Structure formats: structure tokens, C-alpha cells
Amino acid sequence: MCGIVGFVGEANGVKFLIDGLSSLEYRGYDSAGIAGVVNGEASVTKSVGRIKNLEALIPEGLHLELGIGHTRWATHGGVNTTNSHPHQSFNKRFILVHNGVIENFQELKERFFKGVELVSETDTEVIVQLVQVYSDRSLDTKEAFKKAVSKLQGSYALCLIDTEDKDTLYVAKNKSPLLIGLGEENKNYVGSDALAMIKYTNNFLEINDGEFVIVKKDSITIEDKEGNVVERESFSTNLNAGEIDKGIHEHYMIKEIHEQVGAMRNIISHYFDGHDVNINSEIINNVKDADRLYIIGCGTSYNAGLVGRNYFEKWAGIPTEVHLASEFAYNVPLLSKKPMFIFLSQSGETADLRAVLTKLRSVNADYKFLVLTNVDASTLSRECDYTLLLHAGVEIAVASTKAYTAQIATLSILAYEVAKQLSRQPKFDIEQELSVITSAIESILDDTKTIKDLAKNLFTERNAFYIGRGIDYYSACEAALKLKEVSYIQTEGFAGGELKHGTIALIEERTPVVALITSAKLDLNTRSNVSEVASRGANTLIITLEKLARKGDYAIPNVNEDLAPIASIVVTQLFAYYAAYTKGLDVDKPRNLAKSVTVE
């Protein structure tokens, strides 16, 4: 969940290191650091907090033609400069950055450094000290690095500098994302993802698990575990460096909420040809022929999967289960005879999903996997059989907004076409209905002042609740997640009918309770739940469709009830943003969170 960068070339790499880390700050922002070689000696600068804190400490005029950098999300050891990366060997010769978790680092400490006090509390320091151990046994740097890596169990993306070799980065990878960026004019780059390097290159090399890479300014050498040189074609991405800019917006989160209109239009443009759905027929056939679908995701993606299940079961008649990736790999349910697996991951790097993929491939190599992701060059898009891109554009704020609505929209298109192929096509035109949804989102975004005022008046307490029934219950879960992660208000999403079974005991005077009602048949039932909590002092609000609205409700334009979660959730996203903004919180980077969860 950390981010790493590296540079080697005939130029000063300091600006790239800072730019790259800034682009990776969504992965972790407890601390940061850069290091390189100056006059044959290590130059290391580290700080606690954001990249701007690090930048302020960098010596004026620092020139690095070989450098590495790291932004940290703490997994081993407290948040301080001692534990922040880069880490150095005892003799100061070797410097290392690492993303991942070394599962056997305590065992390695006992075996190699018993009685020796290491500098930090991290698992990473053990690696760089191991490199020195093997270097002291007369191995050259490449072999010492390989030997050290061979002792590791767990996940890692590593980038090593030898201060006695100012022309080389040593790189290794296992179960943690890492790319090589091919520069021009004798410059090459390393980064946790393409976003870190997109301002400098859009030409990348994939690194597979177990491979080692020697990166020089004018050459890249990839070796497999046996030391054989591997030839590999480079690739480019659909990333646009301009998307990284906040533009007129104060935060990425509000920018990305507003970008949902454009994202919906992109989805419609990419997945429809005329009025026909434009999705690879192999994907359609694999989903259509499955006897059960397994949608798997984490956090917001899991919530999107809950909505998607409704489409596959209601429209296509295919039994569908939704599972948390973090549980699935270690508690695999009884699988059907002909399953199809659908992964949801904004980044395409989610470690828990990769663990599920590995587990299921070991069960049956013939299983088929589809991933819905926002990043075309991601690990999961390369490792799964099929990919459907979300076409939502770069999402940088830790709290996902436009990727969530894009996931639901894409799932709805897929389910609709599968239903059509099974002669169960719903009695509406989904392209037309998604266009109506897009207009509804635009209308909601035109009313942000009202929504901002509602948020200020509603979310004044320490606890809050969202409730809903049917498909609105899933929206309530996502709305609650969004509010808690950015505003730090303890928020839960509940099925309206479950309030009486325990949760209503938590209702106090002025406790905010927001109900989502986008189904006519569930309108009265949910309003009854709202009355129950209001009579106990709750501060209540109903978000509903115009056709169902009563005095005091917040009404959104009428849309297809099955697809309504794509529109209604936008109101709750704005609630979350303004609740956090009003409290003066860092909306884009909530405490303790990282956007791309690359460790299990």
C-alpha cells in the first residue's frame, strides 16, 4: 500500500522523484523519503507526513542522476522518520525502498541478526541488511540482492541502490505492483504504477513475479528466477497526465464526483454501437453459460457488486453471490459446477483479489475470470482472462466515487446483454435509461448548494445511519462507508426492516438517519421505519424520486428504479464530502487509509 519510484539517467532526477511520489501519495502518506548517490556517498532525506513536508527538507541544489523514493503506509513499526524509507545497510553502502509485507522477517532477524540491534522496527530493513550480509561474503551486488530476495516470504516490490555503482537500479517483484518506465535521452524510471511516471513517459515494461531487473540509463535487463534474460514488448496506457490536475476544484473528491457525468457518457460511448451492446462475445457467452456467478470485491467495489447481483438475478435469472475478497481466499465457499468469477477493482491491483485469483486457479485452471477495472495496465487486467474497463478516468481521491457508479453502470450493461441473449431482456432500452441517469446526475450536481446546507444541518453528531430496503439497502451501505471514511463520523448502513431488531437502541436525540427510497413498492415500508426513528428524536431525511416525494424529502429526477442507485448515491457522496469539508478535514487523504490496497 506504499508507493515507490526510481530514476537513473543523464539528468537531475529529483523533480521526477517528487512528482512521482506526489502521484503515488494516494497509496500512503504516513511518511516519505528519497535517496541517491552524491560524490559516491548516500544522500537520504526523510520526513513524517505528506510529500510537501519532504520537499521542504530536500537540500537546495541536490542533484541525483540515480535515485529512489518512497511514500509510506505503515504496516510494521510506528510513524516516524526512523521507520520511513529509504532504509540503509549498516555500512551505508546499500539503500532500499520496498512496498509489500515480508511475512518471515522476524524469523530472518532471529537467524541473521540475533543480538544485533537493527535501526528500525520495519520488515524492510531486514532486506537491505541481508544484502550487506551476502555482499560481505564476496558476492557482487546483483547476486547479493538475488540471494537476499530468495530468503523472503511474502509480497514485495523492491528497488535497490549500491552507492559504489552510480549507474544502476536493482529491482525485484513478487505479488506487489511495479513497472519500468522507458524514457528518452538516456533516462529510465521505476514506479509502483503508470500514474507515477505518466508525466515523463507513456512507454512501460511489465515485471512478472519472481523476476529481477537491472535498470541502467540506456538499457533494461529482465531476468527470470533461473537467470535467463527475458525479452518483453513495451506497452502504453490510456492515462492522460492532464487528468491528474484538480482544475477548478479544491479537492480531487469533489472533482471526481462532478466527473461522473462525463464518466457515464464515456461508458455509453464505449459499450454501445448504435443501440447494440458492444462487449466481447466471449465475455457474454461465459457469463451466459455459467450456472452461478461470483462477484468479488473489497469496500466500495463490494457494495457495487451487491447492486450488480440484483441485475444478474432479476434480469438474466443467473444465481449470483457477492463475496468480500479478503474472506474468500481463506474461506472458499462451495462452488457450483460451472462458475464464472467477476472481480471488481478500481485500481486493478487489489492484493486480496490477486490472492483469490491464485487460490481459484489452483483449484481449477479452467475457471474463467473477468475484471472490471479503471486501469488498463493493471496487474489484474493482465492476469484475468477478460477485462471490462470502467472508462471513468483517473481517480485519485482515496474515497472512491466515480469508479463506484461506473462499476454499477458497466455491470448493468453486461447483465442486460446477457439477459437479452437468454431471451429475458427487460422491457426497457438500457442505453436510453443510462442517458436519463446521466441527466439526473447532472441535475443533482447543479443543486450542490442545497445538498451542502443539508449536510451541514444533518451531520452534527458523532453517529449517523443510512437505511434502505431492497436495492436501496446496498446504496445505504455504500453511503455509510463514504461518510465514515472521509468525515470520521461513525456511520452504519442498515436494511430498514432490521432497525427494530436491535439498531434502534442506538437512536438518540438528533441522531442523523437518512433513508433512501427509489422503489414505489417499498416506499411506505421505509417511511414507516423513518417515522419510528423520528419519534425517538432522530434528525431524519428521505432521498427519493420526484414521483414519490413528499414535503421535506430531497427529490431527485425520476429514473428507472433498477438503475436509480447510480443517481441517488451521488447525493450521499456530496453529503460525505461536505460533512468532511465543514470539519476542515483532509477530504482526499483520510487518516489511516490508502487507495490502492496492495497488501493482504
Model regions and ranges:
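Glycine-rich oxoanion-binding loops at beta->alpha junctions
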Residues: 65-82, 273-285, 308-309, 313-344, ...
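Active-site phosphate/pyrophosphate-binding segments
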Residues: 260-264, 268-294, 386-512, 583-600
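Acidic/histidine-rich
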Residues: 152-187, 459-485, 520-522, 527
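Short helix-capping/linker segments at secondary-structure and domain boundaries
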Residues: 12-13, 133-139, 166, 186, ...
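Conserved short alpha-helical segments that host acidic/polar catalytic motifs at enzyme active sites
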Residues: 1-246, 250, 265-266, 277-289, ...
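Short, glycine-/Ser/Thr-/acidic-enriched flexible segments
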Residues: 9-13, 39-41, 49-50, 73-75, ...
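Generic C-terminus detector
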Residues: 558-600
